[in-house]
Regions:
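Short glycine/acidic-enriched loop and turn motifs that connect beta-strands
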Residues: 13-17, 68-73, 120-123, 178-179, ...
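Beta-rich, blade/repeat-based domains predominating
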Residues: 16, 49-58, 98-109, 145-168, ...
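Short loop/turn segments immediately following beta-strands, especially the blade-tip
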Residues: 30-37, 80-87, 126-136, 184-192, ...
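Beta-propeller fold detector
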Residues: 39-47, 89-96, 136-146, 194-199, ...
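Blade-loop segments of beta-propeller domains
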Residues: 40-111
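Asp-box/WD-like beta-propeller blade repeats and closely related beta-sheet repeat scaffolds
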Residues: 88-161
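Loop-centered beta-sheet repeat module
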Residues: 168-227
Length: 244
């Protein structure tokens, strides 16, 4: 196809407590024809356990995937090289998630650091990434604390995402279990995460995902347990978030 775009789809391959079925095969590659809208599966799936969240680096050279596994020792993060012509993935390496139910991965703009959120154990990790895309062992692991009023979903901390500020100086982890956004300073040269502050949100709200406005100092937060979008101000100098 002359005018196409490649899509990567992660699937659940193993059952987890929140799933009724898990019939997937791994990561699937599709080609989308931008002229006709036709979607075509381009290859056999890449075999990996529960690649429930995928992230591609800014220049499109690497794809990173979580393996969302409840067992602490089996979950992980994996790196793949992307063929620029075919979109095919080539496995590079994997590292342990250092927690259970890894659910979110993000990459800084230079591709030198990968950030991972573990929902089950409520912690976040950072991993240095080499020039060839190889993941090193985690350079930082931070355990969240706290709980919320929803006894079924908030019995403990549950880190649900970790995203970077537009300038990549700060990282923000939305913790569904503790009703907090935990902020960190990121040192991209070492992959270190330094805890800064915790923004306490409405009790029982269950913050899940955070995105920044592309040109303004605002962020938008989705709170899963109350189905709400919250507008936040962002101080690019200090990294502080405030509810508006």
């Amino acid at each position: 196809m002359s005018n196409s775009q490649y899509l990567y789809v992660g699937t659940y391959t193993r059952l987890a407590p929140h799933l009724e079925a898990a019939n997937g095969s791994g990561i699937h590659l599709y080609a989308l024809d931008l002229d006709t809208g036709a979607l075509r599966c381009n290859s056999e799936p890449i075999v990996i356990d529960n690649p429930s969240y995928l992230s591609i680096d800014k220049i499109g050279n690497r794809l990173f995937s979580v393996s969302e596994i409840e067992q602490h020792e089996e979950g992980g993060i994996s790196a793949y090289a992307i063929d620029p012509d075919s979109g095919a993935l080539t496995y590079i390496n994997s590292q342990q998630a250092n927690g259970s139910a890894a659910c979110y991965v993000s990459i800084n703009d230079t591709g030198s650091t990968a950030l991972l959120a573990n929902y089950g154990t409520g912690n976040v990790c950072s991993y240095p990434v080499a020039d060839n895309g190889e993941l090193s062992v985690a350079s930082a692991i931070h355990q969240h604390q706290g709980s919320g009023p929803n006894s079924e979903r908030q019995e403990a901390a549950h880190a649900h995402s970790i995203v970077l500020s537009p300038d990549n100086k700060f990282a923000f982890a939305a913790d569904l279990g503790s009703d907090q956004i935990i902020s960190y300073q990121l040192h991209s040269d070492t992959g270190q995460l330094l805890p800064l502050a915790a923004l306490q949100l409405q009790a029982g709200s269950g913050p899940r995902h955070l995105v920044f406005h592309p040109t303004q100092n605002f962020a938008f937060l989705i709170s899963e347990l109350i189905s709400q979008v919250t507008l936040l101000s962002y101080d690019a100098t200090s990294g502080e978030l405030r509810v508006l």
